[in-house]
A protein has these predicted regions:
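Substrate-binding groove of N-acetylhexosamine-processing glycoside hydrolases
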Residues: 3-17, 23, 43, 236, ...
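Structural motif
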Residues: 31-42, 70-75, 99-101, 145-146, ...
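Flexible loop/turn segments at secondary-structure boundaries
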Residues: 37-38, 150-152, 180-185, 255-261, ...
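Conserved short-loop catalytic and cofactor-binding motifs
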Residues: 33, 37, 281, 349, ...
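A structural preference for short, hydrophobic beta-strand core positions in alpha/beta folds
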Residues: 61-63, 250, 375
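Contiguous, structured surface segment used for ligand recognition
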Residues: 1-140
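A short, Lys/Arg-enriched amphipathic alpha-helix followed by its capping loop at the start of a domain
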Residues: 45, 49-52, 164, 168-170, ...
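Feature activates predominantly on carbohydrate-active enzymes
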Residues: 10, 82-347, 353, 440
Length: 738
């Protein structure tokens, strides 16, 4: 592997000589570490270097070593961006010098050296080289949502997130600690609180585990608390991040995605036109709203801010403030308005309410020592929808409001969008001419509990916009699953070194060379298949599924989508029968399904071959194989249903009972395949991911188990075989899982 491919992210400047020098074999490297003076601390970097090299080389330092590794402070050369994070490395026979331009740069220099020092056949060899490196963007990291998976992460799991970010030189982890979504499972609103609050003990949310475990040989039905809230380890996580150069900051969604507080404290809720609590949003004319919000903010700052690690950044969210169904358990069919209609609020524009509210929150946080307050952009530059094809741009009003309250240096607008296609993004630049701070928020795929895809087009075009518009940060919208290793690493590359990382094809090829060097052609093929299965294209009709497969999968094929209430449809939804009329009517849709299934099956086989040929990355390749097995199972659900529907029609005509046996065998085969994939899940992924992933997989498995039992145990004359609605055969277990 060439030296540049070992370094993550892609370095800015690297000159490699043809000369090489040997360091020695494992257990026999003669080395010592020296430290020169610097105007900043080198302690963390030096301690890490000593500990890591002792393990890497398998031996202690020697006073008379033939290789001296020196860590020193230095002045950054002209033209270096973010110099406190920059560094240089010079390597030649007998010495390696790490010159850091700041404390963070020293830590990154060590990270790079450790990436370079890899043994081959038990021996360490290096070429002579000179490297100058620094990041294009000042802040680089992830916003990790309060959602499925994160609600079960222990402190050690969160530490692994920090470690993964350190490995790619990222320096900011935002943890969502309060957020709410619509009703989905268990006839409950999806609400999450990740911190305990004194005096507000009712602000806590349980986690329901409901799935079949092949490992246990039984169903799991349990209710537990969220570890971060129950064990109160957010402060420990912040300290762990601080020690490793990663700022860990809280996000508290403070207007949209907000149902728990207004439901429990109805005086704070947005009011409908009759003055009744809407159980969503806030009334910004109600003093109690700010009494509670400021009390919760203050507890976060007082408890988790320390003299050596103050909370200087805080995210208030403020996205997707809208009218929604299924945000009130008492009435899921009514559309509730998060914008207050009380006598005071109804006489203000939404922009006036929004900007006044944001300013109040920012001013309070700034008074508590917070220097940067992040806020989403979509209420500033509205997102394009079918109902609003030409949304309004309120960014000049934002500048006016920030300037009025002296917050231009405090507010940082977080620009987010999900589409891979640049023409379909909600904005084309970040309005640098207005002079407010901005960060970019691509996403990493997020929906790991349902299905994993890699939105590389979105990442590329969003970070391109960040560089063009002078954004200061990349703060990906994320959930954590190492199946997002590829998009996460490409984000790190493009936010560190835009020009050097190159095009999407360049970045994807480099990723394969880094991790699967023995199978470049095969790994490229597997990823190409994956990307084609989940492709997103620039089509006028987002439901043109033959072009836009990602929409096809998300809207029609995965169970997760059927967990939502949709206006005019039964709830719980008629799953999977709701899609059967489309399968009957659209031959092209069915043909596409079968092609996607064949592609997923092929990709799974290729990733298995890649794992065998690349032992250092075998675990990662097998994880990717699992994702392709899951896609195979998803597509097989529907191709099996198509075959069952054809047999049911044949039985209706012939009354041949042998057809029922065929149908039972098909249902059994798909049930067993689903069980195989759930077992693979349990052997592949971390414990905190299993319940949410397995639940979405157990539901289709249970459908086929119920169908098999129904076909085997019901007299043929009594069978009701309309696959568009088989709810009459649903077991209690099937309904409980939902």
């Amino acid at each position: 592997m060439q030296l540049s491919d070992r370094i993550i992210p892609t370095p800015q400047k690297l000159n490699v000589s043809e000369k090489t020098f040997a360091l020695g074999s494992f257990g026999a490297v003669s080395y010592r570490i020296a430290q020169s003076k610097a105007h900043f601390s080198l302690e963390k970097a030096t301690n890490r270097l000593k500990a890591e090299l002792k393990e890497r080389f398998g031996c202690e330092e020697k006073a008379d070593a033939s290789l001296v590794i020196t860590l020193e402070g230095a002045e950054a050369p002209a033209g270096v961006k973010n110099p406190d994070q920059g560094y240089a490395i010079r390597a030649e026979e007998g010495k390696i010098v790490l010159s850091a331009f700041g404390e963070a740069g020293a830590y990154y220099a060590v990270t790079t050296l450790l990436q370079i020092l890899k043994a081959e056949d038990g021996a360490f060899t290096l070429p002579a080289f000179d490297l100058l490196d620094y990041p294009d963007l000042q802040k680089r990291g992830h916003f990790v949502e309060t959602r499925f998976g994160t609600d079960l992460m222990e402190l050690e799991d969160w530490k692994q997130v920090v470690d993964a970010m350190v490995d790619v030189k990222e320096n900011q982890l935002t943890v969502s600690v309060y957020g709410c979504w619509n009703m989905q499972y268990d006839k409950r609103i999806s609400e999450y609180v990740f911190l305990p609050f004194k005096g507000y003990e009712d602000l806590k949310t349980p986690v329901y585990k409901k799935y079949y475990s092949p490992k246990k040989g039984d169903y799991v039905f349990d209710k537990v608390g969220t570890p971060m809230a129950e064990k109160d380890f957010f402060g420990e996580l912040r300290a762990y991040g601080k020690e490793r150069g990663v700022e860990v900051i809280p996000m508290f969604n403070s207007l949209g995605h907000n149902t728990l507080i207004p439901r429990l404290y109805p005086e704070t809720s947005a009011k409908d036109e009759n003055g009744n609590p809407a159980n969503t949003g806030f009334c910004t004319a109600e003093p109690k709203t700010y009494e509670i919000l400021f009390a919760l903010y203050d507890q976060i700052i007082d408890r988790y801010s320390t003299p050596d690690n103050p909370i200087e950044s805080f995210d208030i969210g403020m996205d997707e403030i809208r009218n929604e169904f299924a945000v009130d358990p008492a009435d899921i069919t009514h559309r509730h308005n998060a914008w207050c209609q009380c006598p005071i609020c109804r006489n203000k524009s939404r922009q006036e309410i929004f900007f006044e509210h944001a300013a109040k929150l920012m001013k309070h946080l700034h008074s508590r020592g917070v220097k940067t307050v992040y806020m989403y952009n979509d209420m500033v530059v509205e997102h394009k929808t079918k109902l609003k094809p030409n949304p309004e741009d309120h960014s000049p009003l934002l500048k006016e409001a920030l300037a009025k309250h002296g917050l231009l240096d405090v507010a940082c607008v977080d620009w987010w969008a999900y589409n891979d296609v640049p023409e379909k993004l909600h904005f084309s630049d970040l309005h640098p001419e207005l002079g407010f701070r901005s960060s970019i928020k691509p996403w990493n795929g997020y929906y790991h509990w349902s299905h994993v895809f890699h939105p590389i087009g979105n990442i590329y075009h969003m970070i391109k916009m960040a560089h063009a518009s002078g954004a200061e940060a990349k703060r990906s919208y994320s959930s954590w699953d190492n199946s997002f290793h590829r998009p996460n690493q490409l984000q790190a590359d493009w936010s560190w070194n835009w020009n050097g990382t190159g095009t999407m094809d360049d970045a994807k090829a480099r990723y394969v060379r880094r991790h699967f060097p023995a199978s470049i052609e095969a790994a490229t093929k597997a990823f190409d298949l994956w990307d084609d299965i989940t492709r997103q294209t620039n089509v006028q009709d987002p439901k043109n599924t033959l072009s836009n497969r990602r929409e096809m999968i998300f809207s029609f094929l995965v169970y997760y989508r059927y967990s939502y209430y949709f206006d005019g449809r039964d709830y719980p939804r008629n799953y999977p029968g709701e899609l059967v009329p489309k399968l009957r009517a659209e031959a092209d849709f069915c043909a596409e399904l079968r092609e996607m299934q064949a592609q997923a099956e092929e990709a799974a086989k290729v990733f298995e071959e890649v794992a065998k040929a690349n032992p250092d990355s075998a675990e990662l390749a097998m994880r990717y194989r699992y994702e392709m097995m899951l896609y195979t199972a998803i597509f097989r659900d529907w191709t099996t249903l198509m075959d069952l529907d054809a047999l049911a029609a044949k039985f209706s005509e012939t009354k041949d009972e042998a057809i029922i046996a065929q149908m039972a065998d098909l249902a059994k085969a798909q049930k067993n395949f689903r069980l195989e994939v759930i077992a693979l899940l349990e052997n592949t992924k971390e414990d905190y991911l299993i319940p949410s992933h397995a639940r979405n997989q157990t539901i289709p498995m249970q459908y086929f188990a119920d169908l098999e039992a129904y076909l085997k145990n019901t007299p043929a004359a009594e069978l009701k075989l309309d696959l568009s609605d088989m709810r009459h055969m649903a077991s209690e277990t099937f309904m409980n899982l939902r």
